Amino acid sequence: MSTLWADLGPSLLPAFWVTIQLTVYSAIGSMILGTILTAMRVSPVKILRSISTAYINTVRNTPLTLVILFCSFGLYQNLGLTLAGRDSSTFLADNNFRLAVLGFILYTSAFVAESLRSGINTVHFGQAEAARSLGLGFSDIFRSIIFPQAVRAAIIPLGNTLIALTKNTTIASVIGVGEASLLMKSTIENHANMLFVVFAIFAVGFMILTLPMGLGLGKLAEKMAVKK
């Protein structure tokens, strides 16, 4: 046990810090892209609705591993897209990290868009009709009336998406991002006799990340719920 902790201890917090960074950056990007996709999905412009619907349906039915591998092998290795300076001594690690974030954003934004659309469905259509009768355009109605109420109604689905994103960050290990699951894999390889102990350590680590998130978002949803 002491040997396990001597090998694992110094790397455990840095690995989970990478997991947290992946989650935060991906969540911010997913909210931005997901909001854009939602606006397109409910837009009066047919071509925008079609593009958004096609994107969401395609991504939601594509395995996340394929999306991450596409970003690494397709965008970087085949098309030469780099998201870090080649002169940097940490180029490969930084580039893989940012490609993973890009993949998580592309994937998770589809689920964010669906969560927001479920929130929009709770907003009474009469509010939009009243706003149109006052001369407001779609962008003003969406920004000022529909979207704020949709977010309040969609906190629980958005929270579930965020928790799923936190757990999905383990997929980043397939392109060599040094997050928690990659450390777990290497630790198991070196300490196969401590398999269940290693699993327990990392399970507790992810519970520490996700349980407070779920409880906090649940409280926020109760606080912001529309009183009827």
From Swiss-Prot:
One of the protein's GO biological processes: amino acid transport
Listed transmembrane segments: 16-36, 64-84, 100-120, 195-215
Residue intervals of the ABC transmembrane type-1 domain: 16-217
CDD domains tied to this protein: TM_PBP2 (cd06261)
Keywords annotated in UniProt: Amino-acid transport, Cell membrane, Membrane, Transmembrane, Transmembrane helix, Transport
Family classification: Belongs to the binding-protein-dependent transport system permease family. HisMQ subfamily.
PANTHER family linked: AMINO-ACID ABC TRANSPORTER PERMEASE PROTEIN YHDX-RELATED, MEMBRANE COMPONENT OF AMINO ACID ABC TRANSPORTER
Protein name, UniProt field: Glutamate transport system permease protein GluC
